[in-house]
Amino acid sequence: MSVSVCPCGSGNLLDACCGHYHAGTPAPDAQALMRSRYSAYVLGLIDYLVATTLPAQQAGLDRNAIAAWSAQSTWLGLEVENAEVLGGQPEHAFVTFTARWHDLEGDHQHRERSAFVQHDGRWYFIDPTVELKAGRNDPCPCNSGQKFKKCCASYWGNRA
């Protein structure tokens, strides 16, 4: 049992916060998943970062680059600005946040409006850096059974 404070900024202990998502419990909403992903970067949990990315994108992730960025950064904090649950089938959401870190090049901050989709009781991050080759009439990569244009297409490219 960990007695450390969760890196996500909630003020809760890791085991009572993001730690149980890292251990396999599905995050209940997109904001919880986003916070747990930030904590995973802080803790170097690369398998968790990959597993919580949309399955159709997982093969396109550069695990070594993710691990290097995670390890070479000192994580300074996370601010969640907004979480929008959009509903629908499957359910979609946006979470707007700013993450701060320090590396050899100095202090950085990154503001993003991330898109998420829920499938089979689990939330997944839709990674804007991983290309998907899905035509508008192709089956949606989130495995909803719908055409891409009726499901996740509008969530690609909607970043702040």
Swiss-Prot record:
It comes from the Bacteria. Signal peptide: none annotated. Gene3D superfamilies: 3.10.450.50. HAMAP family: UPF0225. Belongs to the UPF0225 family. This is UPF0225 protein PputW619_1140.
